[in-house]
């Protein structure tokens, strides 16, 4: 065999390797893009609520990821609970997923209590079980406080502190 045909074989082998490597990189990029969530899905994961517009004693309900979220600005006569209250400035809030932890019914709010009509479960104004079959307090959605805004779906230090206590 001549030197020229060995050089030609080496060149063809290196060319094939380079094309295969480039194709592999393009394939990896396409796989990553396919696995990443769509921007519309990412945007749907966050809900922002302006807490400065809330009135003490009045329940506000927003939707986050197709679930009802209860936001209650506590009045001075409501029991303060440092283990579960969300504190923003001088105000205290109950922020919880508005589903009974027994079977997932949506409780109503009356006389400073959340009452589940399905099986008689009662939660206090902080979302803790007072009576009935619910096995635990109402769940707290991940949140972050940004000034007077509550950002649902994003984990902040306030949420981490509450979850450590529960």
Q: What residue ranges belong to the model's regions?
A:
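Extracellular/periplasmic metallocenter environments
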Residues: 99-139
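A generic helix-loop boundary/linker signal
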Residues: 1-2, 90, 117
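N-terminal secretory signal peptides and thylakoid transit peptides that target proteins
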Residues: 1-19
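Residue-level signal for the membrane-embedded core of alpha-helical transmembrane segments
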Residues: 19-26
